[in-house]
Every structure is written in structure tokens, then in C-alpha cells.
Amino acid sequence: MFSCFNNLGLDYCYQCMHGPEGCMVPSRQGDGGELYAHSEELEAKLRGLAKKESLEIEKSLENDKKTYGSHIKILILGGPSSGKSTIFKQMQIIHSNGFKTEQELIQYRGLIDTNIRQTYRQLVSGARVVGISLESLESLVHDINKVYAPMAADEFSIRTIPDVVEPLTAFWNSREIQEVYKRRYEFELLDSTKYYLENLNRISKSDYLPNEEDIVHSRKATVSINSIVFQYTGVSLLMVDVGGQRSERKKWLHLFDDAKVVIFVIDLTGYAKKSEESRTELSRFPNFFNEIGNDAFDMKVALKIFNDVAGSHALANAVFLLFFNKVDLFKELLPQVSLQPCFSKFAEENSYDNTSKFICDKFIRAAKPKKSVFPHFTTATNTENIKMVFRACMESVFKANSKATGLS
């Protein structure tokens, strides 16, 4: 059973490029024993994919150079579902034109419709995982499924929210689903679930077009290279998000050896989650599997990725900005889930101050001793927070050693 087909109804797996019969990405429910059943074949495919992606990245960077000329390059990297693309969208809102054209707004309206449909399906599935019966909601589920059942999970060409707003609102407000939501760390669920489902009446209006807050809460897997150029205090910055690159980083990271700054984003709630994306990360890199096992918490995977990236020769001269993201969700989760299962050496009270300091220290120690690393705690969906943090970050970067940054 492979989750990319069960949950999304896809013809091929975007993670390993196989069809249903040959997919190598195990479902969360599997024991992981099949993880490397076809490792040689997977590695061969990834080598070809890495070469293709390297050429695509190189072409994209060359086009940027021709178009924008000289600039300081900022690379966005990070752990699974950490908010990399959300940070990128915030930069577009704060420092560029944002999202204002009718075409952009209509596209995001469709994506938001899709995200709401995904959250509904995830909540129904999550109820089974945590053992909460939805029998009393059978009528509501039936009414919602009449609209949603014929549609693929990622289909957003048809607007459906106006047709389900009443039963979906009742579904969300039910005692059973609120109990399921409290245990959301036990199954896959979009971070934007609460935000969207509490705004259904507004989103369902016939003249609805998303605002910037709606847009930054939207979620779509990054499958391409995105870049943006903007001016900051008279300096031209090129920000590149390569979150959609699925092949081994060492095979394309050298293309960014001129990056002056790396923003590495960490999902703080990852200490309590073992997501499909983490398992996919492990399936691509056997050395990760050997070091931390196939059932690692997302934060352990992020820590290993950071250790790998921070030690890369290609980024030896880059300043690293650590964005410990989703502070708001992290604070909500702390009373329910201890940090100790993820980090066995943590033995203090599970307070925000204690846990955030412990996590921050873990990541800073994972970098080389002389590496310039500046930690910041963020809520990527909060535009004012990101504006303030980015200002502080750039002040740190501009003050950093001129040999390391090349910015003096």
C-alpha cells in the first residue's frame, strides 16, 4: 500500500517517479521494511533526475544573472514541511508586488478550495487513526462526500466551498472533530486547517478573492525552482527557493557556492511528528536511515539535513540564518506532547523557554564551530513577524565578518 496513490489518486509518484506498481515510497502504516527493496533502481533514477535538476537549476540561475545582474544570493533550505515556501511568499508580499492580479487571486482561490478539501479528508482519516467514531456525523459526512467524493484530492479547477459550507461548518464544530483535532500530531494534517475552517463563511461567498493572509496559509508542494529579486536598503538581493528539488542535495548544491546567505527553516512542531515527507527524505538517503532510523521524528530529520548542509564545502562562506518556525503551533502543542520522546536527553519542564532553548542549542551545535549562525524564532504566516525578523537577520548579516559574507 503506497500512500501517494491511496491519498492523492495520482498516476505516478512525484517522489520516486514510479507508477502504482513500482512506487518505492512506503505508506506511514508500513513497517519500513520495503524502504530499500529497490534501492539500486531508485538510486539510478535519482542520478538521472539529479543531472536533469542540476541543468534546470543552472539554466535558471544563468537566466537570473542575465536578467538582474549583480546581487547577493540568499538560498532557502529546510526540513520537511517547515514553511520554506511560506517564507518565500512573505518576501513577495513585503518586498515585491505581492499577489494582486486577478489571475493570481483566482489561482490561489482554487488552491485554498483544494486545501480545505484536503483538511476534511485528513480529519476523517485521522479519526480512524486515533480511534474516534464519527457515526453520529454520518449525515454530515454523507452530504460533504456527495460533493467531494468524485474529485481528486489535488483538483482545484472546480469551486466547491459554497456547496459544502453548511455541513462542513457543522462537521468542524462537532465535539468529535474537535477531539480529533486535539490529537492532530498523531496523523497528517495541514497546518492551515483551523484557519480555513474557521473562515468558511467568508471563503464561501460568491465574490470571494483571497487576501494575503489567506494566501500565506495556502499549501502546495513545491516542485520547481522559485526566485525573486528585490532591493533592501539599497542592496539587490536574489532569493532562491529550491524546496522542490527531490534529488540528493550534494548533486546540485555546488551550483550555489556563491550564496552569501542560507535561510534554513525548521518546523518546531516536528518534534512530535513523523510525516510522509520525512520518510521520503530517508528513502532517498540511505545514510540518513543508517544514522537515525526509518521512523524518525521530523525534527531529527531536519537536524540531520542541517548538519549535512552546514558542513557542505559549497556553502563554506555563507552566513546561516536559522528560522525556528511555527512558534504559534509549537506553543499550542507543548502542553500535550513532551519533547522527551524526540530528544531522550531532554529532562526539564516542558515549557516554551526550556524546549526552545534545547532545540536551538541542538541545531547550533550541529554546525561547524566557526560557522556564522544566527537563530530566530518565527511564525511564517505572520507578515509583521517575518518583516521584523528579516530586518534583524539582514542587520546580523551586514555586520558579519566581511570575509565570510562579502558584503562589506
UniProtKB/Swiss-Prot annotation:
Residues 73-86 are annotated as: G1 motif. Residues 321-328 are annotated as: G4 motif. GO terms for molecular function: G protein-coupled receptor binding; G-protein beta/gamma-subunit complex binding; GTP binding; GTPase activity; metal ion binding. Mg(2+) binds at residues 85, 222. Residues 378-383 are annotated as: G5 motif. Residues 214-222 are annotated as: G2 motif. Residues 70-408 form the G-alpha domain. GO terms for biological process: adenylate cyclase-modulating G protein-coupled receptor signaling pathway. Keywords: GTP-binding, Magnesium, Metal-binding, Nucleotide-binding, Transducer. One of its GO terms (cellular component) is cytoplasm. Guanine nucleotide-binding proteins (G proteins) are involved as modulators or transducers in various transmembrane signaling systems. G proteins are composed of 3 units; alpha, beta and gamma. The alpha chain contains the guanine nucleotide binding site. This is Guanine nucleotide-binding protein alpha-14 subunit. The lineage of its organism: Eukaryota, Metazoa, Ecdysozoa, Nematoda, Chromadorea. The gene is gpa-14.
